[in-house]
Amino acid sequence: MDKLIITGGNRLDGEIRISGAKNSALPILAATLLADTPVTVCNLPHLHDITTMIELFGRMGVQPIIDEKLNVEVDASSIKTLVAPYELVKTMRASILVLGPMLARFGEAEVALPGGCAIGSRPVDLHIRGLEAMGAQIEVEGGYIKAKAPVGGLHGGQFFFDTVSVTGTENLMMAAALANGRTVLQNAAREPEVVDLANCLNAMGANVQGAGSDTIVIDGVKRLGGARYDVLPDRIETGTYLVAAAATGGRVKLKDTDPTILEAVLQKLEEAGAHINTGNNWIELDMKGNRPKAVNIRTAPYPAFPTDMQAQFISMNAVAEGTGAVIETVFENRFMHVYEMNRMGAQILVEGNTAIVTGVPRLKGAPVMATDLRASASLVIAGLVAEGDTLIDRIYHIDRGYECIEEKLQLLGAKIRRVPG
């Protein structure tokens, strides 16, 4: 199993390009199953989860074509099986996203219950109840969701999400695109990745309105066709590199990103003392060599502060001036990285869903273990601001969400290298 070795103490300084958003790319790839002619998806990040989704398509008889720029063309007309098997789904929770498209287009689907990061319960009941509201018959048995559409296909319906669910919103939006009549999704997720999926569906000929608000209206159409679509930039990757620069007192310019979908994070970085400039597709952060100030964070669904940036801000607070409280309201059990950081000399106290972080001048390098995707990014940041060497184990978590993380950090002057397991 690969490991990362980081020798801390360098301020980050330089420019890098931001990759396409994994959390946008995966639902958009799933949406290609709705089209009866080829769809080309561009600006895909080179990540394990993307490879897994492409491998899943291959198992189903769909053979995507990948060009020299790593754009992927999907022609779902060759599909042979409507089963998403456990051995692939167990490694990637987003596999559940093929359920809605397969059910809407082909009338049935069988998808294994998903795996993914171990950060609390993420029930799929919202997906199931939403599809049932559109007429689907669904059974869960043997670890699989087995779904059938009624004769004549899914019909429009009204569905209220008891809790905001990004993948639930995306799955029902895709299913509704080919359903008969109008579907109204209330208390829908407002994330930029949901908007990106809606834009892609509309480019394929769908009629989706209201994405980005909490009420999405989808008028079903008879067919969806081919399109060429660019995935939006990854706001969490963007935020991670900004926080890494802030924690080290450095300066970075991030290109091919979108500052308008990161406002809550940028506001907190300015509170921490960062000087931030933005353009249409770039963000520049400069700490001017200063130590960050501790900030208070409360996670909540978009447009509030994202749960996927919580761990990185704990790392910054760990070496900041003062004390900051971080309240996690989206997922339970999402402070597992804290115990690893405390082994590096951080002063973090967890009480229920709150972490109280008292900054220290510098952490100390130590062997640590990644527990999930964003926790692993926070340990990388901790390693960058620590004295001596930090060895991070189980970095397959990082590879699920960050494209070429060690190469990008090396471009910014970090001393980081990958050691094969």
From Swiss-Prot:
The keyword Cell wall biogenesis/degradation applies. Keywords: Cell cycle, Cell division, Cell shape, Cell wall biogenesis/degradation, Cytoplasm, Peptidoglycan synthesis, Pyruvate, Transferase. The active site is at 117 (proton donor). Phosphoenolpyruvate binds at residues 22-23. It is an enzyme of class 2 (transferase). GO terms for molecular function: UDP-N-acetylglucosamine 1-carboxyvinyltransferase activity. InterPro entries: Enolpyruvate_Tfrase_dom, Enolpyruvate_Tfrase_sf, MurA_subfamily, RNA3'P_cycl/enolpyr_Trfase_a/b, UDP_GlcNAc_COvinyl_MurA. GO terms for biological process: cell division; cell wall organization; peptidoglycan biosynthetic process; regulation of cell shape; UDP-N-acetylgalactosamine biosynthetic process. One of its GO terms (cellular component) is cytoplasm. The modification 2-(S-cysteinyl)pyruvic acid O-phosphothioketal is found at residue 117. UDP-N-acetyl-alpha-D-glucosamine binds at residues 93, 122-126, 308, 330. Pathway: Cell wall biogenesis; peptidoglycan biosynthesis. It comes from the Bacteria. It catalyses: phosphoenolpyruvate + UDP-N-acetyl-alpha-D-glucosamine = UDP-N-acetyl-3-O-(1-carboxyvinyl)-alpha-D-glucosamine + phosphate. It is found in: Cytoplasm. Cell wall formation. Adds enolpyruvyl to UDP-N-acetylglucosamine. PANTHER family: UDP-N-ACETYLGLUCOSAMINE 1-CARBOXYVINYLTRANSFERASE. Belongs to the EPSP synthase family. MurA subfamily. NCBIfam families: murA, PRK09369.1. This is UDP-N-acetylglucosamine 1-carboxyvinyltransferase. It comes from Pseudomonas paraeruginosa (strain DSM 24068 / PA7). The gene is murA.
